[in-house]
Amino acid sequence: MESNLSGLVPAAGLVPALPPAVTLGLTAAYTTLYALLFFSVYAQLWLVLLYGHKRLSYQTVFLALCLLWAALRTTLFSFYFRDTPRANRLGPLPFWLLYCCPVCLQFFTLTLMNLYFAQVVFKAKVKRRPEMSRGLLAVRGAFVGASLLFLLVNVLCAVLSHRRRAQPWALLLVRVLVSDSLFVICALSLAACLCLVARRAPSTSIYLEAKGTSVCQAAAMGGAMVLLYASRACYNLTALALAPQSRLDTFDYDWYNVSDQADLVNDLGNKGYLVFGLILFVWELLPTTLLVGFFRVHRPPQDLSTSHILNGQVFASRSYFFDRAGHCEDEGCSWEHSRGESTRCQDQAATTTVSTPPHRRDPPPSPTEYPGPSPPHPRPLCQVCLPLLAQDPGGRGYPLLWPAPCCSCHSELVPSP
Protein backbone atom coordinates (compact mmCIF):
# COMPACT_ATOMS: atom_id res chain seq x y z
CA MET A 1 0.00 0.00 0.00
CA GLU A 2 2.90 2.34 0.71
CA SER A 3 4.12 2.00 -2.87
CA ASN A 4 0.69 2.83 -4.21
CA LEU A 5 0.49 5.95 -2.03
CA SER A 6 3.96 7.18 -2.87
CA GLY A 7 2.58 9.65 -5.39
CA LEU A 8 0.91 11.73 -2.67
CA VAL A 9 4.24 12.94 -1.27
CA PRO A 10 7.25 13.89 -3.42
CA ALA A 11 9.59 10.93 -3.37
CA ALA A 12 13.27 11.06 -4.25
CA GLY A 13 14.29 9.37 -7.45
CA LEU A 14 11.00 9.66 -9.34
CA VAL A 15 11.51 10.82 -12.92
CA PRO A 16 9.06 11.44 -15.76
CA ALA A 17 8.04 8.06 -17.16
CA LEU A 18 9.17 8.66 -20.76
CA PRO A 19 12.42 8.20 -22.69
CA PRO A 20 14.89 11.08 -22.15
CA ALA A 21 14.57 12.47 -25.69
CA VAL A 22 10.75 12.56 -25.57
CA THR A 23 10.76 13.94 -22.06
CA LEU A 24 13.14 16.71 -23.07
CA GLY A 25 10.94 17.67 -26.03
CA LEU A 26 7.76 17.72 -23.93
CA THR A 27 9.44 19.70 -21.18
CA ALA A 28 10.70 22.25 -23.70
CA ALA A 29 7.21 22.54 -25.22
CA TYR A 30 5.51 22.98 -21.83
CA THR A 31 8.08 25.52 -20.68
CA THR A 32 7.84 27.49 -23.92
CA LEU A 33 4.04 27.72 -23.77
CA TYR A 34 4.02 28.97 -20.19
CA ALA A 35 6.89 31.38 -20.89
CA LEU A 36 5.05 32.86 -23.88
CA LEU A 37 1.99 33.43 -21.73
CA PHE A 38 4.18 35.03 -19.06
CA PHE A 39 5.72 37.54 -21.47
CA SER A 40 2.33 38.25 -23.02
CA VAL A 41 0.82 39.17 -19.66
CA TYR A 42 3.95 41.14 -18.75
CA ALA A 43 3.53 43.20 -21.92
CA GLN A 44 -0.14 43.81 -21.06
CA LEU A 45 0.84 45.29 -17.70
CA TRP A 46 3.29 47.63 -19.41
CA LEU A 47 0.53 48.72 -21.79
CA VAL A 48 -1.55 49.74 -18.77
CA LEU A 49 1.17 52.26 -17.87
CA LEU A 50 1.78 53.28 -21.48
CA TYR A 51 -1.86 54.07 -22.22
CA GLY A 52 -2.47 55.75 -18.88
CA HIS A 53 -5.10 53.29 -17.69
CA LYS A 54 -6.08 52.96 -14.07
CA ARG A 55 -3.26 51.17 -12.27
CA LEU A 56 -5.30 49.48 -9.56
CA SER A 57 -8.40 47.89 -11.05
CA TYR A 58 -10.02 44.52 -11.63
CA GLN A 59 -8.08 44.25 -14.87
CA THR A 60 -4.64 44.87 -13.39
CA VAL A 61 -5.28 42.51 -10.47
CA PHE A 62 -6.41 39.82 -12.89
CA LEU A 63 -3.31 40.27 -15.07
CA ALA A 64 -1.04 40.21 -12.01
CA LEU A 65 -2.54 36.89 -10.88
CA CYS A 66 -2.06 35.41 -14.35
CA LEU A 67 1.53 36.69 -14.45
CA LEU A 68 2.38 35.02 -11.15
CA TRP A 69 0.66 31.80 -12.22
CA ALA A 70 2.59 31.64 -15.51
CA ALA A 71 5.87 32.36 -13.71
CA LEU A 72 5.34 29.51 -11.23
CA ARG A 73 4.42 27.01 -13.95
CA THR A 74 7.41 28.04 -16.08
CA THR A 75 9.72 27.60 -13.09
CA LEU A 76 8.23 24.19 -12.30
CA PHE A 77 8.76 22.75 -15.77
CA SER A 78 12.24 24.24 -16.03
CA PHE A 79 13.28 21.85 -13.24
CA TYR A 80 12.53 18.89 -15.49
CA PHE A 81 15.30 19.65 -17.95
CA ARG A 82 18.01 18.33 -15.63
CA ASP A 83 17.00 18.70 -11.96
CA THR A 84 14.11 16.25 -11.64
CA PRO A 85 15.37 14.73 -8.36
CA ARG A 86 15.80 18.21 -6.92
CA ALA A 87 12.22 19.11 -7.85
CA ASN A 88 11.06 16.06 -5.88
CA ARG A 89 12.99 17.07 -2.74
CA LEU A 90 11.82 20.63 -2.23
CA GLY A 91 11.12 22.18 1.14
CA PRO A 92 7.59 22.91 2.35
CA LEU A 93 7.41 26.49 1.05
CA PRO A 94 8.95 25.93 -2.42
CA PHE A 95 6.90 22.73 -2.72
CA TRP A 96 3.67 24.60 -2.03
CA LEU A 97 4.57 27.52 -4.30
CA LEU A 98 5.38 25.36 -7.33
CA TYR A 99 2.78 22.60 -6.96
CA CYS A 100 -0.18 24.03 -5.01
CA CYS A 101 -0.16 27.81 -5.40
CA PRO A 102 -0.99 27.82 -9.16
CA VAL A 103 -4.30 26.09 -8.44
CA CYS A 104 -5.11 28.71 -5.81
CA LEU A 105 -4.29 31.48 -8.27
CA GLN A 106 -6.66 29.99 -10.83
CA PHE A 107 -9.43 29.89 -8.27
CA PHE A 108 -8.73 33.53 -7.41
CA THR A 109 -9.13 34.51 -11.08
CA LEU A 110 -12.46 32.66 -11.17
CA THR A 111 -13.72 34.51 -8.09
CA LEU A 112 -12.49 37.78 -9.60
CA MET A 113 -14.63 37.18 -12.68
CA ASN A 114 -17.60 36.46 -10.43
CA LEU A 115 -17.02 39.66 -8.50
CA TYR A 116 -16.90 41.81 -11.60
CA PHE A 117 -19.99 40.42 -13.31
CA ALA A 118 -21.88 40.52 -10.01
CA GLN A 119 -20.88 44.17 -9.71
CA VAL A 120 -22.18 44.85 -13.22
CA VAL A 121 -25.56 43.36 -12.30
CA PHE A 122 -25.85 45.19 -8.97
CA LYS A 123 -24.74 48.52 -10.43
CA ALA A 124 -27.49 48.24 -13.01
CA LYS A 125 -30.06 47.79 -10.21
CA VAL A 126 -28.75 50.17 -7.57
CA LYS A 127 -29.94 53.28 -9.41
CA ARG A 128 -33.59 52.33 -8.96
CA ARG A 129 -33.14 50.34 -5.75
CA PRO A 130 -30.43 51.87 -3.53
CA GLU A 131 -30.79 49.09 -0.98
CA MET A 132 -29.15 46.71 -3.47
CA SER A 133 -25.75 48.16 -2.51
CA ARG A 134 -25.88 46.03 0.65
CA GLY A 135 -26.32 42.93 -1.47
CA LEU A 136 -23.15 43.79 -3.40
CA LEU A 137 -21.20 44.00 -0.15
CA ALA A 138 -22.55 40.59 0.89
CA VAL A 139 -21.52 39.06 -2.45
CA ARG A 140 -18.02 40.48 -2.12
CA GLY A 141 -17.70 39.09 1.38
CA ALA A 142 -18.86 35.65 0.25
CA PHE A 143 -16.29 35.42 -2.55
CA VAL A 144 -13.48 36.70 -0.34
CA GLY A 145 -14.41 34.08 2.25
CA ALA A 146 -14.45 31.34 -0.39
CA SER A 147 -10.98 32.38 -1.57
CA LEU A 148 -9.60 32.32 1.97
CA LEU A 149 -11.14 28.89 2.62
CA PHE A 150 -9.65 27.51 -0.59
CA LEU A 151 -6.22 28.88 0.29
CA LEU A 152 -6.34 27.60 3.88
CA VAL A 153 -7.34 24.06 2.91
CA ASN A 154 -4.62 23.76 0.28
CA VAL A 155 -1.90 25.14 2.56
CA LEU A 156 -2.81 22.82 5.44
CA CYS A 157 -3.04 19.75 3.23
CA ALA A 158 0.29 20.52 1.59
CA VAL A 159 2.07 21.01 4.92
CA LEU A 160 0.57 17.92 6.55
CA SER A 161 1.23 15.80 3.49
CA HIS A 162 4.85 16.92 3.31
CA ARG A 163 5.41 16.14 6.99
CA ARG A 164 3.36 12.91 6.84
CA ARG A 165 1.32 13.82 9.91
CA ALA A 166 -1.96 12.59 8.46
CA GLN A 167 -3.19 9.73 6.30
CA PRO A 168 -2.72 10.50 2.59
CA TRP A 169 -6.22 9.30 1.75
CA ALA A 170 -7.83 11.62 4.31
CA LEU A 171 -5.83 14.61 3.09
CA LEU A 172 -6.66 13.88 -0.51
CA LEU A 173 -10.35 13.45 0.28
CA VAL A 174 -10.60 16.73 2.19
CA ARG A 175 -8.63 18.71 -0.36
CA VAL A 176 -10.51 17.43 -3.40
CA LEU A 177 -13.95 17.73 -1.81
CA VAL A 178 -13.42 21.29 -0.61
CA SER A 179 -11.42 22.64 -3.55
CA ASP A 180 -13.43 21.11 -6.37
CA SER A 181 -16.75 21.84 -4.70
CA LEU A 182 -15.75 25.51 -4.52
CA PHE A 183 -14.76 25.37 -8.19
CA VAL A 184 -18.19 24.02 -9.13
CA ILE A 185 -20.04 26.56 -6.98
CA CYS A 186 -18.09 29.49 -8.43
CA ALA A 187 -18.58 28.19 -11.97
CA LEU A 188 -22.34 27.97 -11.42
CA SER A 189 -22.46 31.44 -9.87
CA LEU A 190 -20.56 32.81 -12.86
CA ALA A 191 -23.13 31.23 -15.17
CA ALA A 192 -25.93 32.84 -13.14
CA CYS A 193 -24.26 36.26 -13.31
CA LEU A 194 -23.84 35.98 -17.07
CA CYS A 195 -27.51 35.06 -17.46
CA LEU A 196 -28.50 38.16 -15.49
CA VAL A 197 -26.18 40.33 -17.57
CA ALA A 198 -27.74 38.96 -20.76
CA ARG A 199 -31.29 39.45 -19.48
CA ARG A 200 -30.60 43.07 -18.55
CA ALA A 201 -28.72 43.82 -21.75
CA PRO A 202 -30.06 47.39 -22.28
CA SER A 203 -28.65 48.56 -18.94
CA THR A 204 -25.58 46.33 -18.70
CA SER A 205 -24.31 46.35 -22.27
CA ILE A 206 -22.71 49.77 -21.81
CA TYR A 207 -20.15 48.26 -19.42
CA LEU A 208 -19.21 45.53 -21.86
CA GLU A 209 -19.20 47.84 -24.88
CA ALA A 210 -16.81 50.15 -23.04
CA LYS A 211 -14.32 47.32 -23.19
CA GLY A 212 -14.94 46.72 -26.87
CA THR A 213 -16.97 43.53 -26.54
CA SER A 214 -20.63 42.59 -26.45
CA VAL A 215 -22.99 40.64 -24.25
CA CYS A 216 -22.86 37.65 -26.61
CA GLN A 217 -19.07 37.52 -26.57
CA ALA A 218 -18.95 37.82 -22.80
CA ALA A 219 -21.56 35.08 -22.44
CA ALA A 220 -19.60 32.79 -24.78
CA MET A 221 -16.37 33.34 -22.87
CA GLY A 222 -18.07 32.84 -19.53
CA GLY A 223 -19.77 29.68 -20.76
CA ALA A 224 -16.43 28.25 -21.89
CA MET A 225 -14.92 28.98 -18.48
CA VAL A 226 -17.86 27.34 -16.74
CA LEU A 227 -17.52 24.18 -18.83
CA LEU A 228 -13.75 23.94 -18.35
CA TYR A 229 -13.70 24.52 -14.60
CA ALA A 230 -16.80 22.44 -13.90
CA SER A 231 -15.54 19.52 -16.01
CA ARG A 232 -12.22 19.57 -14.19
CA ALA A 233 -13.93 19.51 -10.80
CA CYS A 234 -16.45 16.84 -11.77
CA TYR A 235 -13.68 14.63 -13.15
CA ASN A 236 -11.69 14.82 -9.93
CA LEU A 237 -14.72 14.16 -7.74
CA THR A 238 -15.84 11.22 -9.88
CA ALA A 239 -12.39 9.70 -10.00
CA LEU A 240 -12.05 10.01 -6.24
CA ALA A 241 -15.41 8.34 -5.67
CA LEU A 242 -14.51 5.40 -7.94
CA ALA A 243 -10.94 4.93 -6.73
CA PRO A 244 -10.41 2.49 -3.83
CA GLN A 245 -8.25 3.61 -0.95
CA SER A 246 -5.53 1.14 -1.86
CA ARG A 247 -5.19 2.36 -5.48
CA LEU A 248 -4.84 6.12 -5.34
CA ASP A 249 -2.29 6.09 -8.12
CA THR A 250 -5.10 5.67 -10.67
CA PHE A 251 -6.41 9.11 -9.69
CA ASP A 252 -4.58 12.27 -8.67
CA TYR A 253 -4.89 14.23 -11.90
CA ASP A 254 -5.54 17.28 -9.72
CA TRP A 255 -2.43 19.34 -10.58
CA TYR A 256 -0.89 18.71 -7.18
CA ASN A 257 2.49 17.20 -8.02
CA VAL A 258 4.24 16.25 -11.23
CA SER A 259 5.76 13.18 -9.54
CA ASP A 260 2.23 11.86 -9.02
CA GLN A 261 2.02 11.30 -12.73
CA ALA A 262 5.39 9.54 -12.80
CA ASP A 263 3.87 6.94 -10.47
CA LEU A 264 1.28 6.04 -13.14
CA VAL A 265 3.68 3.92 -15.18
CA ASN A 266 1.82 0.72 -14.22
CA ASP A 267 -1.52 2.10 -15.44
CA LEU A 268 -0.58 4.28 -18.39
CA GLY A 269 2.64 2.71 -19.59
CA ASN A 270 5.11 5.42 -20.60
CA LYS A 271 2.45 8.11 -21.04
CA GLY A 272 2.14 9.49 -17.52
CA TYR A 273 4.16 12.63 -18.14
CA LEU A 274 2.40 13.22 -21.47
CA VAL A 275 -1.06 12.80 -19.90
CA PHE A 276 -0.14 15.20 -17.13
CA GLY A 277 0.96 17.83 -19.64
CA LEU A 278 -2.22 17.46 -21.68
CA ILE A 279 -4.35 17.83 -18.57
CA LEU A 280 -2.51 20.99 -17.62
CA PHE A 281 -2.95 22.32 -21.15
CA VAL A 282 -6.72 21.71 -21.27
CA TRP A 283 -7.64 22.71 -17.72
CA GLU A 284 -5.00 25.33 -16.92
CA LEU A 285 -3.24 26.85 -19.90
CA LEU A 286 -6.24 27.01 -22.25
CA PRO A 287 -8.69 28.83 -19.93
CA THR A 288 -6.04 31.24 -18.70
CA THR A 289 -4.93 32.08 -22.24
CA LEU A 290 -8.53 32.69 -23.31
CA LEU A 291 -9.12 35.00 -20.37
CA VAL A 292 -5.92 36.97 -20.97
CA GLY A 293 -6.82 37.44 -24.63
CA PHE A 294 -10.39 38.44 -23.82
CA PHE A 295 -9.45 40.95 -21.09
CA ARG A 296 -6.39 42.34 -22.85
CA VAL A 297 -5.50 46.01 -22.61
CA HIS A 298 -6.92 48.14 -25.42
CA ARG A 299 -5.54 51.33 -26.87
CA PRO A 300 -7.72 54.30 -25.87
CA PRO A 301 -9.55 55.93 -28.79
CA GLN A 302 -7.87 58.99 -30.25
CA ASP A 303 -10.95 60.38 -32.01
CA LEU A 304 -12.43 63.22 -29.98
CA SER A 305 -15.76 62.74 -31.71
CA THR A 306 -16.35 59.74 -29.45
CA SER A 307 -16.09 61.91 -26.34
CA HIS A 308 -19.03 62.88 -24.18
CA ILE A 309 -19.44 66.11 -22.22
CA LEU A 310 -20.80 65.57 -18.73
CA ASN A 311 -21.34 68.51 -16.36
CA GLY A 312 -18.91 70.67 -18.29
CA GLN A 313 -16.14 68.04 -18.50
CA VAL A 314 -15.08 65.93 -21.44
CA PHE A 315 -15.07 62.15 -20.93
CA ALA A 316 -13.83 59.96 -23.74
CA SER A 317 -15.44 56.55 -24.15
CA ARG A 318 -12.25 54.81 -23.06
CA SER A 319 -13.81 53.21 -20.04
CA TYR A 320 -12.00 50.09 -19.01
CA PHE A 321 -13.80 46.82 -18.54
CA PHE A 322 -12.48 46.36 -15.02
CA ASP A 323 -12.13 49.97 -13.87
CA ARG A 324 -15.50 51.48 -12.96
CA ALA A 325 -18.48 49.36 -13.78
CA GLY A 326 -20.94 51.95 -12.48
CA HIS A 327 -19.38 55.08 -13.97
CA CYS A 328 -22.33 56.12 -16.09
CA GLU A 329 -24.85 54.89 -13.53
CA ASP A 330 -23.16 57.05 -10.86
CA GLU A 331 -23.15 60.11 -13.07
CA GLY A 332 -26.85 59.65 -13.80
CA CYS A 333 -26.60 60.50 -17.48
CA SER A 334 -27.94 59.07 -20.68
CA TRP A 335 -26.88 59.58 -24.25
CA GLU A 336 -29.17 60.02 -27.23
CA HIS A 337 -27.72 59.89 -30.72
CA SER A 338 -29.82 61.05 -33.67
CA ARG A 339 -28.32 60.07 -37.03
CA GLY A 340 -24.85 61.10 -35.89
CA GLU A 341 -25.76 64.83 -35.87
CA SER A 342 -26.17 65.67 -32.19
CA THR A 343 -25.23 64.45 -28.73
CA ARG A 344 -27.44 65.22 -25.78
CA CYS A 345 -26.75 65.06 -22.05
CA GLN A 346 -29.28 66.13 -19.43
CA ASP A 347 -27.96 67.14 -16.01
CA GLN A 348 -29.86 65.34 -13.23
CA ALA A 349 -28.69 67.78 -10.52
CA ALA A 350 -30.50 70.88 -11.84
CA THR A 351 -31.86 73.38 -9.33
CA THR A 352 -34.88 75.68 -9.48
CA THR A 353 -32.68 78.76 -9.93
CA VAL A 354 -31.00 77.50 -13.08
CA SER A 355 -32.12 78.87 -16.40
CA THR A 356 -31.17 77.27 -19.68
CA PRO A 357 -28.81 79.52 -21.64
CA PRO A 358 -29.81 80.22 -25.18
CA HIS A 359 -27.49 79.21 -27.95
CA ARG A 360 -25.90 82.14 -29.74
CA ARG A 361 -26.29 81.40 -33.43
CA ASP A 362 -25.18 83.38 -36.40
CA PRO A 363 -28.03 85.13 -38.23
CA PRO A 364 -29.30 83.19 -41.21
CA PRO A 365 -27.69 84.28 -44.46
CA SER A 366 -29.73 86.42 -46.78
CA PRO A 367 -30.62 85.10 -50.23
CA THR A 368 -28.39 87.71 -51.85
CA GLU A 369 -25.39 86.65 -49.81
CA TYR A 370 -25.56 83.03 -51.03
CA PRO A 371 -26.93 82.93 -54.55
CA GLY A 372 -26.84 79.14 -54.66
CA PRO A 373 -29.80 76.88 -53.88
CA SER A 374 -28.58 76.33 -50.29
CA PRO A 375 -26.05 78.11 -48.04
CA PRO A 376 -22.66 76.44 -47.69
CA HIS A 377 -22.89 76.38 -43.89
CA PRO A 378 -26.38 75.57 -42.64
CA ARG A 379 -27.50 76.70 -39.24
CA PRO A 380 -26.23 74.35 -36.49
CA LEU A 381 -28.67 72.03 -34.81
CA CYS A 382 -27.42 71.87 -31.23
CA GLN A 383 -29.28 70.03 -28.51
CA VAL A 384 -26.74 70.49 -25.69
CA CYS A 385 -27.65 72.52 -22.64
CA LEU A 386 -24.70 72.95 -20.27
CA PRO A 387 -25.29 75.56 -17.54
CA LEU A 388 -22.04 76.30 -15.74
CA LEU A 389 -22.76 77.97 -12.40
CA ALA A 390 -20.60 80.29 -10.32
CA GLN A 391 -21.23 82.40 -7.26
CA ASP A 392 -22.05 86.05 -7.89
CA PRO A 393 -19.06 88.05 -6.64
CA GLY A 394 -21.39 90.95 -5.84
CA GLY A 395 -23.13 88.94 -3.15
CA ARG A 396 -26.59 89.15 -4.70
CA GLY A 397 -26.93 85.37 -4.74
CA TYR A 398 -27.73 85.04 -8.45
CA PRO A 399 -26.04 82.25 -10.42
CA LEU A 400 -23.84 83.32 -13.28
CA LEU A 401 -23.70 81.41 -16.56
CA TRP A 402 -20.26 81.22 -18.06
CA PRO A 403 -19.66 80.77 -21.79
CA ALA A 404 -18.98 77.16 -22.76
CA PRO A 405 -18.21 75.52 -26.11
CA CYS A 406 -20.86 73.43 -27.81
CA CYS A 407 -19.78 69.83 -28.51
CA SER A 408 -21.54 69.50 -31.87
CA CYS A 409 -21.08 72.86 -33.62
CA HIS A 410 -18.10 74.29 -31.62
CA SER A 411 -19.91 77.61 -31.13
CA GLU A 412 -20.48 79.25 -27.78
CA LEU A 413 -23.14 79.09 -25.09
CA VAL A 414 -23.72 82.53 -23.57
CA PRO A 415 -25.85 83.70 -20.63
CA SER A 416 -29.27 85.19 -21.13
CA PRO A 417 -29.43 88.95 -21.44
Curated annotation (Swiss-Prot):
Residues spanning the membrane: 32-52, 61-81, 90-110, 141-161, 176-196, 219-241, 275-295
Keywords: Autophagy, Glycoprotein, Lysosome, Membrane, Transmembrane, Transmembrane helix
Cytoplasmic side: 53-60, 111-140, 197-218, 296-417
Residue stretches of biased makeup (Polar residues): 345-354
Residue intervals annotated with topology Lumenal: 1-31, 82-89, 162-175, 242-274
GO biological process, one term: positive regulation of TORC1 signaling
Subcellular location: Lysosome membrane
Chain positions carrying an annotated carbohydrate: 4, 257
One of the record's GO cellular component terms: lysosomal membrane
Membrane topology label: Multi-pass membrane protein
Broad class of the protein's primary localization: membrane
Region (Disordered), start-end ranges: 344-375
Ranges of biased composition (kind: Pro residues): 364-375
Keyword Transmembrane: yes
Protein purpose: Lysosomal integral membrane protein that may regulate MTORC1 complex translocation to lysosomes. May play a role in autophagy. May activate Wnt/beta-catenin signaling to modulate epithelial cell function.
Family: Belongs to the GPR137 family.
Protein name as it appears in the record: Integral membrane protein GPR137
Source species: Homo sapiens (Human)
